[in-house]
A protein has these predicted regions:
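SF2 helicase motor core recognition
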Residues: 3-8, 29-30, 44-68, 72-93
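Structured helix-beta-strand junction loops
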Residues: 13, 39-40, 60, 82, ...
């Protein structure tokens, strides 16, 4: 629903957008990706699950906006790699934007999105530290992760 709603909003505002999500057949996905690469439309709406692997957009796309994201670090990292590659020209930018909805809960600002993003950032730091130090650390159990995300509720 989110992808379709955002797409319709963009189209209503004169922005040529197309969508790829789980129900889009493979042949159609491939055509939509090729059309995006060739500039036939301005915005490609998708999600990290759908285009997590084997799609390179780095030659034509340098901005990613995450309206929703999964709690899976691998999905996020693979998704970010769709528009960023080693060897990009000097001065080439790549930007990532992360929407975060905030709500008043018990007279306090709360954002599930911000909490999930923070946990993803923590997981990425732990992963990079493990690679740099060649030492694996104990990480949170799924139950502890849930407590970190939902503990304020």
């Amino acid at each position: 629903d989110s992808i379709a709603s955002i797409s319709q909003c963009l189209i209503d505002n004169g922005i040529n957008a197309k969508c790829i999500y789980g129900a889009v057949p493979l042949e159609e996905r491939l055509q939509l990706i090729e059309d995006f690469r060739s500039g036939k439309y301005d915005v490609l709406l998708t999600n990290p699950h759908t285009l997590a692997e084997s799609v390179s957009l780095h030659s034509v796309c340098h901005d990613a906006i995450y309206y929703e994201y999964s709690y899976n670090l691998v999905h996020l990292l693979q998704s970010k790699d769709r528009i960023h590659r080693l060897g990009l020209p000097d001065g080439q930018y790549t930007q990532y934007y992360y929407f975060q909805n905030w709500y008043d809960y018990n007279e306090k600002a709360y954002s599930l999105d911000a909490n999930i993003y923070q946990r993803l950032s923590d997981k990425e730091r732990i992963m990079l530290d493990a690679i740099d130090n060649q030492h694996l650390e104990a990480v949170c159990t799924p139950e502890e992760d849930l407590e970190l995300i939902f503990g304020e509720l």
